[in-house]
Amino acid sequence: MIHVTVPATTANVGPGFDCLGIALSLYNHIEVEEIPEGLVIEVSGVDQDLIEKDEGNLVYQSMLKAFKAIGYQPSGLRIKQYNGIPVARGLGSSAACIVGGVLAANKMCGSPLSQDEMLEIAVEVEGHPDNVAPALLGGVVVSNRYEGKTHYVRALVHEDLKFLTAIPNVPLGTKEARDALPRVVAFEDAVFNVGKSSLLVAALFSGDLEKIKPALQDRLHQSYRAKLMSSLESVFLETEKAHLDSVFLSGAGPTVILLRWQKEGQREIKFRDIIYRMEENWEIQDLKGDNIGAQVLN
């Protein structure tokens, strides 16, 4: 039995739309083994009823992609998934399944694929690297596609960074969140995000944490996606009124994160108070960065 664990990820991180991601200390566990024939999938944990348990299962589909690249055909598979990452909440649940499947298949075959080869397979399944890259590699990752290849730069998440993560009990589909975005944006908004994302990446990579707060603002996606859920829009309005300037939408949403890096009790209390006043039930988890990424545990 091969056991792998994969971290959750937060993509975009404010202005870093479709290119910036950070691995977080929240995990999915996947166990796989080859069996004489057939396919057996068992799922437990968070949102287990939302996970397919047949050939449409994302872990299974990702394993098949890796097996094809390796040139191996298993006789049958048993897959056990334990979900710690909520589904369709903007925390990279799909990326975790994809990376876990690719890593497990590679290990089953004696690990012939390099890390970069596994990343390319994961990107092929997911369609973009912003979540799968930090899920596989850990840390803070800036990534992009150029001439059919994934290019990335990785840094460690600073040990002082904390991610106070508010997760609503209502999922938001990635397609719905993508469809909410405008096809054309104002030139000044594009320039605004280039400046903010450049400063944010420099601050995260250099460890100059005081430069993070003035770099987290966004004009390309958050305001449009916030309108998809009334309480989400209220969260952003209320946090702005409370001068909580390090709050951002995780991925496509609806999860919201307060990023902090020192003992900021009053800011945390304000954030929790705002979240708990919302209509939907929200769960708050205090997470940190994961600098290891996906790994085989046995």
UniProtKB/Swiss-Prot annotation:
Record key words, sorted: Amino-acid biosynthesis, ATP-binding, Cytoplasm, Kinase, Nucleotide-binding, Threonine biosynthesis, Transferase
Coiled coil location: none
PROSITE patterns: GHMP_KINASES_ATP (PS00627)
Catalytic activity: L-homoserine + ATP = O-phospho-L-homoserine + ADP + H(+)
Subcellular location: Cytoplasm
Amino-acid positions noted as binding ATP in the UniProt annotation, renumbered to this chain: P86, V87, A88, R89, G90, L91, G92, S93, S94, A95, A96
Main location (coarse class): cytoplasm
Pathway field: Amino-acid biosynthesis; L-threonine biosynthesis; L-threonine from L-aspartate: step 4/5
UniProt superkingdom: Bacteria
UniProt xrefs under InterPro entries: GHMP_kinase_C_dom, GHMP_kinase_C_sf, GHMP_kinase_N_dom, GHMP_knse_ATP-bd_CS, Homoserine_kinase, Ribosomal_Su5_D2-typ_SF, Ribsml_uS5_D2-typ_fold_subgr
Cystine crosslinks: none
Gene Ontology MF term list: ATP binding; homoserine kinase activity
Family (UniProt): Belongs to the GHMP kinase family. Homoserine kinase subfamily.
Record-linked HAMAP family: Homoser_kinase (MF_00384)
Protein name, UniProt field: Homoserine kinase
Species of provenance: Alkaliphilus metalliredigens (strain QYMF)
